[in-house]
Amino acid sequence: MDFGLIFFIVALLKGVQCEVKLLESGGGLVQPGGSLKLSCAASGFDFSRYWMSWVRQAPGKGLEWIGEINPDSSTINYTPSLKDKFIISRDNAKNTLYLQMSKVRSEDTALYYCAR
């Protein structure tokens, strides 16, 4: 039997199991002054052990860090200009990160990403 081939298959399967996935949802159109809650479903890693962040990218601009939350939600840090508008939370039982947006304005138009 070719042990090199067996090792390759095992390594390949292990790689598939360790694939990190972050899937954002909840975006859409909202009226000025309105609110919106984004979700980020995580898989492929132990979500409850990691700090998680939200970042955004407005059209034609670079990435802007919104904030981060520690594994047990006891520490949450925000970009100062956004801390009164956005609330970051998480549910470790559901492997999900949240971004509650309020007082939304046109300058909040962006692609929003969660990050580990």
Curated annotation (Swiss-Prot):
CDD domains from the UniProt entry: IgV_H (cd04981)
Domain named Ig-like: residues: 19-116
Taxonomy, superkingdom: Eukaryota
Entries under Gene3D superfamilies matching the protein: Immunoglobulins
Pfam families (UniProt xref): V-set
Leader peptide range in chain numbering: 1-18
Lineage: Eukaryota, Metazoa, Chordata, Craniata, Vertebrata
Cross-referenced SUPFAM superfamilies: Immunoglobulin
An annotated GO BP: adaptive immune response
Keywords, alphabetical: Adaptive immunity, Immunity, Immunoglobulin, Signal
CC per GO annotation: extracellular region; immunoglobulin complex
Protein name: Ig heavy chain V region 441
